[in-house]
Amino acid sequence: MNVCIYGVGRYGISTYYKLGRRGINIICFGDRNVQKQGYIVKDIRCIPFEKVLELDKNKTVIVVAIKQNNAQLVDMFREKGFRYVCSYNDIKDRADEKILLIKRCQI
């Protein structure tokens, strides 16, 4: 299972390290902010929102890692057809449980 972290700010970077330490395959960051697109963290590139929507909806976990409107973005990604979506708060509050679910593709 591949993971896209949506948001490359403080929460996104924190999520990257939290998941990366547990062996989760992070393929990209995503962000609507044009200034952040192309930003690279440890060889992981930030792609535009439109490119996030082109990812395989059945094989990509989207972790929404932003401070504001994260519940709305989780809902929006689900409406766009992504099967596996969670928020930074899910990872932060129940990290081990959620990471296990990510590995099993059961989010």
Pin down the residues of each PLM region.
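Structural/interface elements that position substrates and couple domains in central-metabolism enzymes
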Residues: 6, 13, 24-25, 72-79
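Short amphipathic alpha-helical surface micro-motifs
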Residues: 10-12, 28-29, 43-47
